[in-house]
């Protein structure tokens, strides 16, 4: 009897260990709630009917170029601050246009490590007015300062929003990628000094053409990424697993366009395992767009 009792006890122990796992396996994986989509808007949507506030939003500060103003900024921020995220205490994000022009007659370019009375600590040394990383760093720092002033001028009190740097070939850039990188580093330095989080919006191709490889010593290296180029909710989801713009970065948002609106998919912080129905954008009325709008839209976030 003793061997039988031992065998019976062993079988009961095995059943106790296997039972719950087997039940879980039969039940299948736990389904995650489908993530909601967000929108980004800016000056091209001025005068247009906006959709109901989405889960989250990103609003453009500029009018398509650095150091310009989105004329509808205040109204669009008011719309964006009705999103689900804003209701939960997270204000809508903003994005700013970026460019490195170099010393040209029609645009301001620095000649020293100062701007509006501020002494700028420059990792590239002294700016002498030339087309160098040192001067690009000061220029970027100054553009970011102006962007913050634009946001404050719109009556916005939530300065500590997430700020995205819009890096696209549609704006002016120099042939030297190191100079272009310094421009973005200067912007990042000023914005992070105000206590905000900064990220980069671009595509792999455009970022490679403008900036190229970024090393661990750059303040761009670990920034979160917002990747453009997806064509649908499904491909936006797939873009979450794409390579980041920098080796130390992470893909946080992906973007696709439908109708006259850009839609954004928020990537999960962990790898996607459970499959669930993808959220779909609400139908939008078709509107005729001019050739000029189409050309600008291809070069800028709308």
Which stretches of residues belong to each language-model region?
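Structural alpha-beta junctions
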Residues: 81-91, 188-198, 219-222, 247
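Aromatic-lined carbohydrate-recognition surfaces of secreted/lumenal glycan-active proteins
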Residues: 95, 191-211, 223-225, 229
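Glycine-rich, charge-decorated loop segments at or immediately adjacent to ligand/cofactor-binding or catalytic sites
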Residues: 102-109, 206-217
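Secretory targeting and sorting signals
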Residues: 1-25
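Functionally critical loop-and-helix segments that line ligand-binding/catalytic clefts
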Residues: 27-52, 217-302
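Substrate-binding cleft of extracellular glycoside hydrolase catalytic domains
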Residues: 28-183, 193
């Amino acid at each position: 009897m003793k061997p039988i009792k031992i065998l019976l006890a062993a079988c009961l122990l095995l059943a106790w260990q296997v039972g719950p796992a087997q039940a879980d396996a039969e039940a299948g994986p736990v389904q995650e709630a489908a993530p909601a989509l967000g929108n980004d808007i800016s000056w091209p949507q001025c005068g247009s009917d906006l959709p109901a506030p989405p889960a989250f939003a990103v609003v453009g500060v500029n009018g398509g170029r650095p150091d310009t103003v989105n004329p509808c900024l205040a109204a669009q921020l008011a719309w964006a601050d009705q999103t689900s995220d804003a209701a939960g205490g997270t204000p809508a994000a903003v994005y700013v246009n970026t460019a490195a022009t170099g010393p040209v007659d029609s645009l301001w370019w620095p000649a020293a490590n100062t701007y509006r009375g501020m002494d700028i600590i420059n990792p590239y040394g002294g700016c002498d007015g030339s087309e160098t990383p040192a001067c690009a760093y000061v220029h970027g720092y100054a553009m970011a300062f102006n962007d913050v002033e634009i946001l404050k001028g719109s009556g916005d009190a939530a300065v500590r929003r997430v700020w995205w740097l819009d890096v696209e070939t549609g704006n002016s850039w120099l042939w030297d990628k190191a100079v272009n990188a310094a421009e973005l580093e200067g912007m990042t330095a000023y914005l992070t000094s105000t206590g905000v989080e900064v990220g980069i919006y671009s595509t792999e191709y455009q970022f490679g053409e403008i900036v190229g490889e970024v090393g661990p010593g750059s303040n761009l290296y670990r920034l979160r990424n917002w990747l453009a180029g997806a064509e649908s909710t499904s491909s936006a989801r797939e873009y979450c697993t794409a390579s980041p713009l920098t080796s130390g970065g992470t893909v946080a948002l992906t973007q696709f366009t439908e109708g006259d609106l850009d839609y954004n998919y928020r990537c999960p912080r962990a790898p996607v395992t459970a499959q669930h129905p993808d959220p779909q954008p609400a139908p939008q009325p078709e509107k005729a767009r001019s050739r000029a709008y189409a050309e600008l839209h291809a070069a800028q976030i709308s």
